Amino acid sequence: MSPTAGENILLKAEALSVYYGNSLAVKDVYLEVLKNKIVAFIGPSGCGKSTILRCFNRMNDLINGCRVQGRITFHDQEINDGRVDAVELRSRIGMVFQKPNPFPKSIYENIAYGARINGYQGDMDELVEKSLRQAALWDEVKDKLKDSGLALSGGQQQRLCIARTVAVQPEVILMDEPCSALDPISTLAIEELMQTLKEQYTIIIVTHNMQQASRTSDYTAFFNARATEGGGKMGYLVEFDTTEKIFDSPDQEATADYVSGRFG
């Protein structure tokens, strides 16, 4: 079941399937993402969570042999329409990856570089400060903006990547296991940051951490996978609903088994 709220639907996937070559990786996904909400994608490894996440800003275009069937709409516009520029789409739907990946540049330039490429004409110092504040990093780095972003701790690097993402003023932030390489304190900082960010942005997060999904998200999509001929896996969406519903009274037995730790 997908939540619906009329004009608040920002992203929608309909009959979405993804192939790698001739192999069907994820089949027939339907879901809706509401504005200023956090949606968590959960499920065992190989069920297609990250594959579906990358569909929303066409990162899968960069994977040789990957093709998408079905529809994804953003503000009711089909994003795979030939008239949609993928680079512009990615500025509106940004991404934070599993491993922090700051540019080999100064902290300042990590923020300014993308904004400059995207044609930002305003006060760059102001944008850098605003972005770092939004990522709850400003107070820690304000006196060392000329230092390399690579010199920061892992948690700080991930927040720098979030600051870099928000600097280009996206509407949606995709997060692919953003805390998997971080310690518990840094993870908590990112989770607290997400609650602040959702006031301005819509967030979709892939996570293997059930507690993180239940703590941070408004809606949860549970994916699973079944074995295919040749030893592969095909992912599919089992259930999508409010996080409270998914964790407390899911409709599907497989969902209940997964969130309770009985498999996965």
Curated annotation (Swiss-Prot):
Transport in keyword set: yes
Catalytic activity: phosphate(out) + ATP + H2O = ADP + 2 phosphate(in) + H(+)
Gene Ontology molecular functions: ATP binding; ATP hydrolysis activity; ATPase-coupled phosphate ion transmembrane transporter activity
Keywords assigned: ATP-binding, Cell inner membrane, Cell membrane, Membrane, Nucleotide-binding, Phosphate transport, Translocase, Transport
Broad class of the protein's primary localization: membrane
One of the record's GO cellular component terms: plasma membrane
Binding locations of ATP: G43, P44, S45, G46, C47, G48, K49, S50
Disulphide bonds in the chain: none
Entry-linked InterPro entries: AAA+_ATPase, ABC_transporter-like_ATP-bd, ABC_transporter-like_CS, P-loop_NTPase, PstB-like
Gene3D superfamilies in the cross-refs: P-loop containing nucleotide triphosphate hydrolases
EC number in record: 7.3.2.1
The protein's role, per its UniProt record: Part of the ABC transporter complex PstSACB involved in phosphate import. Responsible for energy coupling to the transport system.
Similarity remark: Belongs to the ABC transporter superfamily. Phosphate importer (TC 3.A.1.7) family.
Subunit description: The complex is composed of two ATP-binding proteins (PstB), two transmembrane proteins (PstC and PstA) and a solute-binding protein (PstS).
Full protein name: Phosphate import ATP-binding protein PstB
